[in-house]
Amino acid sequence: MQVILLDKIAKLGGLGDQVAVKAGYARNYLIPQGKAVMATKANIETFDARRAELEAKLAAGKAAAEERAAKLGELAAVVIASKAGDEGKLFGSIGTRDVADAITAAGVAVAKSEVRMGNVLRNTGEYEVVVQLHADVKATVQVQVVAL
């Protein structure tokens, strides 16, 4: 199925690209999320008319993400306190929601979906966590897990 992308999508393309995707991906994700429209003649003409507006919107979103990334870069290590055993092993774990809540409490609003962690944190110590604020903008935050 041919679609026109209205946003930059990782491993697929950028704004205005006409790409072929599987029908289910288009119908169930791209079109309902407003990230693409079907590539019909009418939609192509409409897109060409709105291209400058969409590019400005995309640039504004990226600028806002870069501003948030600068604020994240200024943060000192974010401290998360959790119950732990004598050897530093946590009772439970710290996931993306806990990290996002701690960063938001430190003064920069971050959503759970923006936090990128390979695994949950299960031990005390210092970790580097990547926060993906935009398709092109990433920031690294120091997270320090301490025992209560």
Curated annotation (Swiss-Prot):
SUPFAM superfamilies: L9 N-domain-like, Ribosomal protein L9 C-domain. InterPro entries: Ribosomal_bL9, Ribosomal_bL9/RNase_H1_N, Ribosomal_bL9_bac/chp, Ribosomal_bL9_C, Ribosomal_bL9_C_sf, Ribosomal_bL9_N, Ribosomal_bL9_N_sf. It holds the Pfam family Ribosomal_L9_C. GO terms for biological process: translation. One of its GO terms (molecular function) is structural constituent of ribosome. One of its GO terms (cellular component) is ribonucleoprotein complex. Keywords: Ribonucleoprotein, Ribosomal protein, RNA-binding, rRNA-binding. Binds to the 23S rRNA. Belongs to the bacterial ribosomal protein bL9 family. This is Large ribosomal subunit protein bL9. It comes from Aeromonas salmonicida (strain A449).
